[in-house]
């Protein structure tokens, strides 16, 4: 309560002081109503006859120290005037009040008073007395309301004024009591003096009494000054705390403590009696005891407050706040130093680097560097010790022996503490010296070794400015050298010892504090010297303070700030940086801030111009621009100590040429961090941000979305490559031909163009950042061209040197940037392959859940999407392999200018041509000097499992050795794309092969294999049997019929067999449909592994179909039957010999198309241990894709089976659960057996197909099979030669060629049957068989075409026109003996046209109805609509028909 009352009373006296004008001097002190302080107390303590007081100015000085120096001499308290004087003073005060009232009235203008009088007169004239009473009552009530409102307002908002007024009332009562006691004392003293004078004897006794009275009077006057100081000083301390003047607070508190100890330890009875009556002194001291705690809290708050308030704060305020911690909280120098660092760190992160700031990052970083610079500068001038102290002050002029004698004034206990401290300090310094002397082999030197390597010279320390500041409250000027904190402690020591003078102008000095009691010096030292002992201990610690501790702790402080900044705030400040261009601009600005470390510290003055005034003005103008160096106040203050007298200037050292201290040097001295350290730190920050920008840029490139968007816009030429192949592009025919050659559809080209543009945009963005590595020095010529004076030219040259020196320090790590790009590209590509694979898996799993009505549409969409994904995957990974620089694989040439010259703009046509030229083949080694043949080149490509026979290398790839290493590093990600391509193709192949195989199965089961009339449309062959003098009778059933006599050229020693003219139409349609599906993929770029898998899928499907067809057949003399069970229905299929012959021919024809000469029809042939490489898939990536597909299919089958089993379990009873488990086990066993069979079959596809043929051959008689075998082989060779071009997709692997044979005819002139088969008859005269005449057929030989390395053969318009003209002029008449066979052949050839297998039956019926209406020339005429079908397969059909007609001719 006492503390709060003093606080409130102080605020009240402030308001009163604003109205005070002056205090008159003279005999009595007249205090006005608005005077400062307690009126009664001032009337009692200051009515002493003295000289006039100095007037108080109206400025903002609130110090009460004027009362301490109010007079030069004081009279005794016996001269205090009596109560009459007090009453006189009171009456004079009342008169003064009335005079003030009259003055206020005189200030009102006369016209206003006249106006008021006239208004009152008019008011009384116009209103009755009752109305006047009502008006009076109304006005009085309003006044009362206003009074109550005013009371509430004052009570709520101005409570401190009310409390202050209450305190004033209490003080009035206490002063009245004091005045009464003093008046009583005065009367008694008068009586005593009268008695003493009455009994005085002699002149000597009178002189002694007079001297004694003077001494007592002097002591009482000193006592009155002390009391006045102690009563008024709390208000001053409060004002100093409010203005953060902690240095003044400490001075006042130490002085108050010293004075209080002087008063309380006084042995004079008169003074003790006076002190017992002045209880306010004790109360004031009790309230002042709280100031240390309050000051500590305020000083810490000041150190940790926001930067907006401490910008421009003078350094003396920091000195006062830090010295408060040493003085009041008893902290050591190290603890104070740590507290300073912690406070600076909190200010930095709470204000400058706060997350709530909205300043640009450039301003934030600039303020951070400025803050760090000022912090290092404060450490340098406040804490950094000097090895040799020069004597600047008076108390340092004494020799060292006198300084050692000061220890006698310190107590024994404290001397023991100091001696122990010094011994420990010596041990510590000796250990440091031993550590520094030992040499270490480590790469990183210790802090001590760093300091030894770069010691601070005395010249550099002398460059630090001398602090020269003036305290307006103390009215003193201080001149301190660094470290300033040590000088401050010395001043506190002098204050605590009472070594200061009381004066009014600062010129007169005197030691009056020793006169109050000359007999108790020891007790005073014991009571008031505790603070001086603590300060002495701190000074000793400061003298032995090691700079290595500053070095180490400051270095840790800088590292902690940088680490917190990197971990917590970098992302916040750099969140708005979205591109490398913005990052490059920010990087250049921040590096400019760091390069300022080369500049000289602006507070430093070189020794040559070491002037006290110039150094002081520089530090005060820069460090504290808001504080004025000259004080305008004139209030009296406590003067400085002997150590801070201005009459002892600092000696100027001898000028020596010394390099000025730069910020870089100061940082290296204090913390060992220089410009390179901050450059490396921010370089790491920029690298982290660059990585974040790269990751964000690549994450925005969603390859899966681009793929899906392009798929939603694909056209027919994208779905079917054959349509795109024959499409003529008028805009860019050259590029169109290149794309067709490389198998690139418009959608593929659009995909590559988009991703190339996006990737090049990323590269172009980072060009701005990487171009900083090639920054030239600042153009010196431009700066030198300025015709300025010499000083400006020197400054320009200096700045240019500073900015050009660290050129090598600001290079960004380009290798890491490239690695980040490579890593991000791998990540995006991995996400693309994963999402695409998941999409294919989803299509497979959802396909079976489609409804029956939408099955066809959904299946087509699914196949189109899967085919599109597989095509795109292959084009993509081929493009990556051929362009490693473009796709970040080659870290050395990612930013090659040849690849990104036009990166900032969209792709031009020429640029896209360069990119897409080399898609078809991976990079090949350069050719040897001796050119290899095409066959050798093709053999090399086959060994590498490449489906392309192109030996062209990519023009972009120049260094093949480096590219091979690059491809090895990036092989896993390329393999993923390749596996995705294989996976899509596997799904696509299984889909369309399964669909067409199902149709073929239906055709096979619906076909009449027991038709005995089929031989009417077959070709007849007569086989002559040699008799050797004996007749050989053959069974008609075995040879197809024998005659005893010669009938139609057939004698009794010959046999007739029939061979079909061509294969079954559904077999041709089956192969044609699959060939059309394959043509959707460019044959030029299709992978051989895909063709092998198509053949494998066809073989497995045929094996299952034929096995089901012949599994239950039974052979008889006439026919055999086969039972098919499907959907609980049984179909009986009957076979005769001709049916088996037809099925055998069809299967052998398919086998020869698929495998060529590798097919072995012998049933005893076993599978080879090492299958042929043409049909076996050895690629491990393909096997991975196939295993994944099988796992997805098994998952789907298991899900379907589980659903069916759940439905059955709900319907069935609990008794049937065991049966269901048995069934499940059986199903699993069957599935495992089927999988094992399929694996065994897939290991050797040729052997599997031979097993299919073996199934049919088992149902034929071996003798019949021996008769038919040679003719079947000849038929298959001829048919294969005709359809070689049609089914080139299958022939592409084995490339088997059948040599053409000559036709044979009978001498009798009878024409042989069509299709160039051989017929024989006997020779006239019975001389045996004559040699038949042969006729050469003009069959085209495609052997040379297959041996070439051409990707595909395009037929010119002239060639096609010649072929169609030959067909148009071909004869249409044929012999009558073969008209039926020709008609059948024409019907079958119409069936073999490239039509859709699904609509096969409808088209077959239409063709049979229109056979007689259409002729062959009209179908193949150039003007016919069918001749304009732009498919490669149908062109092959036309060629085969032409070959058939020429052969028949």
From Swiss-Prot:
Annotated spans, Disordered: 503-529, 916-960, 1303-1338, 1401-1422
Classification via InterPro entries: COG1 (IPR033370)
Cellular component terms (Gene Ontology): Golgi apparatus; Golgi membrane; Golgi transport complex
Any single biological process term in GO: protein transport
Keyword Transmembrane helix on entry: no
Biased composition (Polar residues): 1305-1322
Compartment list: Golgi apparatus membrane
Keywords, sorted A to Z: Golgi apparatus, Membrane, Protein transport, Transport
One Pfam family per UniProt: VPS51_Exo84_N
Topological category with respect to the lipid bilayer: Peripheral membrane protein
Keyword Membrane appears in the UniProt entry: yes
Low complexity composition bias: residue spans: 517-528, 930-960, 1401-1414
PANTHER family per record: CONSERVED OLIGOMERIC GOLGI COMPLEX SUBUNIT 1
UniProt function note: Required for normal Golgi function.
Homology family: Belongs to the COG1 family.
Subunit description: Component of the conserved oligomeric Golgi complex which is composed of eight different subunits and is required for normal Golgi morphology and localization.
Protein name: Conserved oligomeric Golgi complex subunit 1
Organism in which the protein naturally occurs: Dictyostelium discoideum (Social amoeba)
